[in-house]
Amino acid sequence: MGIARWLNRTVGFFVFALLDIADFLLCYTYKTLDYFLESERKPCYCSSPPEAKAKTEKIIVSERGGYSKVVSLTRSKIHFDEISDTLYSRGPSLLTRLSKLVRSVKCFNYKGLIMRGNVVESCDHHESKKKISKGKKRLMTLNSTVIEKSSTAPRWSDCHCSFCTSWLTSTNRDSLFVKVQQPKDNKKARDNVVFIHGFVSSSAFWTETLFPNFSDSAKSNYRFIAVDLLGYGRSPKPNDSLYTLREHLEMIEKSVISKFKLKTFHIVAHSLGCILALALAVKHPGAIKSLTLLAPPYYKVPKGVQPAQYVMREVARKEVWPPMQFGASVLSWYEHLGRTIGLVLIKNHQLIEFVTRLLTLNRMRTYLIEGFLCHTHNGSFHTLHNIIFGSGAKLDSYLDHVRDHVDCDVAIFHGGKDELIPVECSYSVKSKVPRATVHVIPDKDHITIVVGRQKDFARELELIWQRTKST
């Protein structure tokens, strides 16, 4: 191990120990604020079910007679296999380990251990069961997952500006926001191209970069469709959603494929969007004309390792350098610190945009700020865990299906200096789909693979689509 690597890990140990303490304190801070501002202490993923207040709207599901974490009800449907275990088992923090040690010592000294056959249960766990039974909650066992019904209204810590809440006043509150660029003069498009953005981004990532730079020929032959994913940009941001893969796919199918009656289409996807693109290819194998994936987050999971946990530790290594890696780690591991970032930055994104324009004399376009800051913590936190981490066990089968059953061109682009998703991920995709072509762009990172080289990338995409037409 080099000195720089050792220093990064050593400093990271102390920094993340402090973040453990901060997140622990913020947990109780938000419970107090939620109670005063929303008249309810909503349970988080570091709380246990007994701490949740017994209300008629809540459903708590037992796991083999015990109790697990409380998560949110997925709107009208409950799909337990879509919920990543990284949400409620991200690994014990320093404070959690210490508190468990103290509780176990107290338990042994004052109450002893409760023996049941070959199972040893702590008295702390036994007391939890007593508290739940006294609360007279209605219990129901469903696929060993705990859920709780919650409200659809934005939380007090979310942004309530007209842009972020435009979906609440829309006539179609159950559809995603879609930006469409049609051929001019009402000419019928020869083909359709669907653009899917990545994590903490929006359709502006495509519409502000690629759309203006396509050639006149492409603009007259293709219909370009860029979508704001569920929870981002001007799309719905339901607070009662778990933002699972199934929900994201259903919304894309409803808002894009069904609405525009797409029989065939090309897909261009970035980062998180690559997972959704592959899932769409599996569901609609005959409709896909080409797949263009930018920085796909595909990690080969070793045998015997829990996929979601492995992917999380690869994406969000607890290191302080580089900065993007540190940011990903904070958002992944710390629920309450992530919410604080949302409270400080997301809730004030309009002020940040104004100051940015003021400091740059209005010479800097702020469309990236829209993507980075126009979402909710609930949406980004669940999407990160349920899609990027939770899909770790699914991508192998998706890629196998694309290789064997989806007859389309597969092109992969990756920045040579991408510090968030390593280039090896793209080569891993090629190892699963040998016909895929990998293009590593030197000196470009996770964002500048498009931003700053949009003209070149627009030409590269057009060549891919033309090649598809000629085959």
From Swiss-Prot:
Keyword Signal tagged: yes
A molecular function (GO) term: hydrolase activity
Lipid-conjugated positions (N-palmitoyl cysteine): C46
Domain of life: Eukaryota
Topology term for the membrane: Lipid-anchor
Keywords: Cell membrane, Cell wall, Cell wall biogenesis/degradation, Hydrolase, Lipoprotein, Membrane, Palmitate, Secreted, Signal
GO biological processes: cell wall organization
Sequence ranges assigned to domain AB hydrolase-1 in this UniProt record: 193-296
Function as written in the Swiss-Prot or TrEMBL entry: Involved in cuticle development and morphogenesis.
Protein name (Swiss-Prot/TrEMBL): Probable lysophospholipase BODYGUARD 2
Record organism: Arabidopsis thaliana
Protein encoded by which gene: BDG2
